[in-house]
Amino acid sequence: MNPRGNPSKMPTQIVLNRRPAAPARPQTTFTSLSQYHMYNTASTSSAPPPPPNQNFGQIREAIRTTQPTTVQLPPDCKLVEYTWQENGESRTVLIPMSNDSTEDDVRSALPQSVLESINQHQNQLRQGNAQAVHYYQKHQNPISHEKPIMVNPRQYKRIIKRREMRQKMEDSGRLPLERQKYMHESRRQHALKRRRTGGRFDANAEAAAASSEPSISSAAPSPPKAPRAPTTYAMIRPATSHPPVNIPKAPAMTYRPVQEEKKSIERISKAQMFTIPKRQQ
């Protein structure tokens, strides 16, 4: 009631329409290359659903304007947000679909221009990933030392024959695959056996002493020998043999020994000394 008692001068009430609330967070997500966010924003109003064309126009208007816009959907409908990248910019399309719609249904509802841009972007991503993987494998893998060694054909035949013979001996059991003793181990055992009176080698005495004095190490089971890995060989390849080069030989030059030259000079000088000059008429 107005304190002055004048009902005509009461203040007028102004009601402001609040902005609609932001859409709820996605409850379902499609697992694909692009982002499919499902918005189950079923309207609680009893108003009949708008026609498809009008609904799609409202969705496009909601994308263009920055202010929030309310979209009424039937209870058995959901709003799908499809986001993709085009020319470095993020683009979004809202499509009303039924609750039992699949990813293929959403793709079929997209415009043809959108599908072409998405396929082009996915192809660029695949090419970039392939180049990155190739670069990673090329530069991150350790450098292999198994490069073929160039040998001459005669060495190649000899090496291949020796490898085949060794492989046959390993398969037949003539070459054991157990680790052989190192040189320092065998020398130590030999030195222990020579520690007897007079420094003589006595293997039987050491074996008897070892059997008479049992130790913890002898009672314990001996560890199994580490098996030797199969023999691995380096890669070899015969070098291409070049044809022999025919170099023209120089004509052979004959050289007379020095003694023969001296004898010939002496013979000539003696003949000149004993020659009788002709009489001059």
Curated annotation (Swiss-Prot):
Motif (Subunit association domain (SAD)) on chain: 150-173
Pfam families: CBFB_NFYA
Chain intervals for the UniProt region annotation (Disordered): 1-27, 163-261
Compositionally skewed regions (Basic residues) per UniProt: 189-198
Keyword list, A-Z: DNA-binding, Nucleus, Repressor, Transcription, Transcription regulation
Stored InterPro entries: NFYA
DNA-binding region(s), residue ranges: 180-204
Compartment(s): Nucleus
Comp. bias (Basic and acidic residues): 166-188
Tissue expression per record: Highly expressed in certain parts of the gonads. Expressed in the spermatheca, intestine and in some neurons in the head. Not expressed in the intestine, the hypodermis, body wall muscle surrounding the pseudocoelomic space, secretory cells in the pharyngeal terminal bulb wall, in the small ganglia surrounding the pharynx and in the neurons running anteriorly to the sensory organs in the head.
Entry GO terms, CC: CCAAT-binding factor complex; nucleus
Entry annotated with the keyword Transcription regulation: yes
GO molecular function (one): DNA binding
Quaternary organization: Forms a heterotrimeric transcription factor complex (nfya-2-NF-Y complex) composed of nfya-2, nfyb-1 and nfyc-1. Interacts with the nfyb-1 and nfyc-1 dimer; the interaction is required for subsequent binding to the 5'-CCAAT-3' box motif in DNA. Does not interact with either nfyb-1 or nfyc-1 in their monomeric form.
UniProt name for this protein: Nuclear transcription factor Y subunit nfya-2
